């Protein structure tokens, strides 16, 4: 754990001490080095399942894929941000990269925490850099409104969790995940216990977000700069799913009765957000709503608590993290050239940027879960688990996948095909940096297709 955490912390002096000429080069190279070191976590040597560096930090098959995803994304975010941050004063550039590195530090400590209270603190700490990135480097004036939504939704959801954790500490005497998963089931039968159960999960359902608690997400995504959108879609939403998986083990007897309304909301959200996507004109908003739909499937898979549901959820979280991040990068490359997120005003780009169209096509196919990509594997496992739980869910999930395919193709055709609008007269060609960025997003998806057991979690 420390072999990644210490180099990440050492990024801070690197950022502030390197000369302005070499700032982006050194930080990109160092973060790539950290990303490659983190791949060693995937080689599992421990017999117990837990690979602990001390009593506070440990990795297990559930957190390892998410830790590696976090480390993999930092260099990609730095690469994606170079163009639009380069024109700012050097100290602001340093501040921006510092915020991205601090986000990675908090995420590693959140996914690697063995004490739930430490996970909670790091879960909340990620809020501050994300909020600064959205409200300081966002594109439009609405970014302050988006930041307010983001802050208050997350805080309002998280306060009950803190109270619930203090009550858990009082009743069991420990908040260690290692101890709690082997302790006797808690006898939960009163109304107070049911409220406590909801308090444990609401924070994670807001973060995922569950349909109905999702209004902060499209606003935050649309207003955030490219790196903010990437980290939000790829890793911050996954904190919610990861936290739910960790907490569900302890809430077992009650979840069987109380999870129904949340499963219904999650599945209903898959269809509703898909239909919303079909009516979107804003490219980033469409990708943001598609994230809500995919995370609805993940929430459904986790809430029914079967091994297939859990495995499908973690596979879909990793695959969706890479895919949605790639889509936001592509949306940014088109925005940097046309200065518009409205799809009708930025259409027909296949004529000008043919290779970028290939990346759009692959990313959209991954988004609609084309076989044999891991997105399909995750969705199939969740759909199968839900079908075993109740055969009627196949109607909802089947319609959901159909609508997903529809809006993915709608996004591709609207942004790439057709004639170029008359107001677009001068477009710069694609940079090698952008092609490298897309390659590094899509290569892991293809490699995971060949060896999916790297992200199967505990079911391996």
UniProtKB/Swiss-Prot annotation:
Record protein name field: NADH-ubiquinone oxidoreductase chain 4
Q: Which organism is it from?
A: Danio rerio
Show the taxonomic lineage. Answer: Eukaryota, Metazoa, Chordata, Craniata, Vertebrata
Reaction(s) this enzyme catalyzes, per UniProt: a ubiquinone + NADH + 5 H(+)(in) = a ubiquinol + NAD(+) + 4 H(+)(out)
Q: Where in the cell is it found?
A: Mitochondrion inner membrane
Q: What is its EC number?
A: 7.1.1.2
Membrane-crossing residues? 20-42, 61-81, 94-113, 114-134, 148-168, 195-215, 225-245, 258-278, 285-304, 308-330, 351-371, 380-400, 436-456
Q: Which gene encodes it?
A: mt-nd4
Question: Which NCBIfam families does the record associate with it?
Answer: NDH_I_M
**One Pfam family of this protein, by short name?**
Oxidored_q5_N
The EC category is: translocase
Q: Which family does it belong to?
A: Belongs to the complex I subunit 4 family.
Role noted for this protein: Core subunit of the mitochondrial membrane respiratory chain NADH dehydrogenase (Complex I) which catalyzes electron transfer from NADH through the respiratory chain, using ubiquinone as an electron acceptor. Essential for the catalytic activity and assembly of complex I.
Q: Which GO terms describe its biological process?
A: aerobic respiration; electron transport coupled proton transport; mitochondrial electron transport, NADH to ubiquinone; mitochondrial respiratory chain complex I assembly
> What's the subunit arrangement here?
Core subunit of respiratory chain NADH dehydrogenase (Complex I) which is composed of 45 different subunits.
**One GO cellular component from the entry?**
respiratory chain complex I
The membrane-topology field of this record reads: Multi-pass membrane protein
Q: Which GO terms describe its molecular function?
A: NADH dehydrogenase (ubiquinone) activity; ubiquinone binding
Q: What is its main location?
A: mitochondrion
**Entry keywords, A to Z:** Electron transport, Membrane, Mitochondrion, Mitochondrion inner membrane, NAD, Respiratory chain, Translocase, Transmembrane, Transmembrane helix, Transport, Ubiquinone
Q: Which InterPro entries does UniProt cross-reference here?
A: NADH4_N, NADH_Q_OxRdtase_chainM/4, NADH_UbQ_OxRdtase, ND/Mrp_TM
């Amino acid at each position: 754990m420390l072999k990644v955490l210490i180099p990440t912390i050492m990024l801070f002096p690197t950022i502030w001490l390197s000369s302005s000429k070499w700032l982006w080069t050194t930080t990109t190279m160092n973060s790539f080095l950290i990303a490659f070191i983190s791949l060693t976590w995937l080689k599992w040597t421990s017999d117990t399942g837990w690979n602990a560096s001390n009593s506070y930090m440990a990795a297990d098959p559930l957190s390892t894929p998410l830790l590696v995803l976090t480390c993999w994304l930092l260099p990609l975010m730095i690469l994606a941000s170079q163009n639009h941050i380069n024109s700012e004063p050097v100290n602001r550039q340093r501040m921006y990269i510092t915020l991205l590195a601090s986000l990675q530090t908090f995420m590693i400590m959140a996914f690697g925490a063995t004490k739930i209270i430490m996970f909670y603190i790091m879960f909340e700490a990620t809020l501050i850099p994300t909020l600064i990135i959205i409200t300081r480097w966002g594109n439009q004036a609405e970014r302050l409104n988006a930041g307010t939504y983001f802050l208050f939704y997350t805080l309002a959801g998280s306060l009950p969790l803190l109270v619930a954790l203090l009550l858990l500490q009082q009743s069991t005497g420990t908040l260690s995940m290692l101890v709690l998963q082997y302790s006797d089931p808690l006898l939960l039968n009163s109304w107070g216990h049911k409220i406590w159960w909801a308090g444990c999960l609401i924070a994670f359902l807001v973060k995922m977000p569950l349909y109905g608690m999702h209004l902060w997400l499209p606003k935050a995504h649309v207003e955030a700069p490219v790196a903010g959108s990437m980290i939000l879609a790829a890793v911050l939403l996954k904190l919610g799913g990861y936290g739910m998986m960790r907490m569900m083990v302890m809430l077992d007897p009650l979840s069987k009765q109380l999870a129904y309304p949340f499963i219904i909301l999650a599945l209903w959200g898959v269809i509703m957000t898909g239909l919303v996507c079909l009516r979107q004109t804003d490219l980033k908003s469409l990708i943001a709503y598609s994230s809500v739909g995919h995370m609805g499937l993940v929430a459904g898979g986790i809430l029914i608590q079967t091994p297939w549901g859990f495995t499908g959820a973690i596979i879909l979280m990793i695959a969706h993290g890479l895919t949605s991040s790639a889509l936001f990068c592509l949306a940014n490359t088109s925005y940097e050239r046309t200065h518009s997120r409205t799809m009708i005003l930025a259409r027909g780009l296949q004529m000008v940027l043919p290779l970028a169209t290939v990346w759009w096509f692959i990313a959209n196919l991954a988004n609609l879960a084309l076989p044999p990509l891991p997105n399909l594997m995750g969705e199939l496992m969740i759909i199968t688990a839900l079908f075993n739980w109740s055969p009627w869910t196949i109607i909802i999930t089947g319609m959901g996948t159909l609508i997903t395919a529809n809006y993915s193709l709608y996004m591709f055709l609207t942004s790439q095909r057709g004639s170029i609008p008359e107001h677009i007269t001068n477009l710069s060609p694609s940079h090698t940096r952008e092609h490298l960025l897309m390659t590094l997003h899509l290569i892991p998806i293809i490699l995971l297709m060949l060896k999916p057991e790297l992200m199967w979690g505990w079911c391996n």
